[in-house]
Amino acid sequence: ASFTTTWSIDLHRPDPENTRYFPGREFKATTDHVVIYPYPVPYRCLYSRNIDNLFMAGRNISVTHVALGTVRVMRTTGMMGEVVGMAASLCKKYQATPRDIYHYYLEELKSLMQKGVNKKGLPNNQRYNEGGRLNQIPKVK
């Protein structure tokens, strides 16, 4: 895994009331939130399957619409950016494609991810949605 997502499954859909009153022009959405355990996201989600030299770090990540409901938030997309930056440095170092990093240099990427990019010596006092670490039991459908 290259990063972990902790956000609940957060799916938006048109509000049925607005569908009735504004057919085809729904402007207000409702959401379904499902609490999840944090889960790891594979590095392979961060590069294109059919364009050799294309990384995707953000809401264009290669996932299903349900998985996008958990990875589209800012903290998680920031972690994607860190991993893609590390992988891009290896692409330059080895004149390799993102897919090559997975096949030939994954251990080196893991080593970079283990070190991290954070500034050393700063307190780790940031709070975020801790997903499955809450006292709620995630729903599995």
Predicted segments with their positions:
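Flavin (FAD/FMN)-binding glycine-rich loop and adjacent Rossmann-like elements that form
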Residues: 1-141
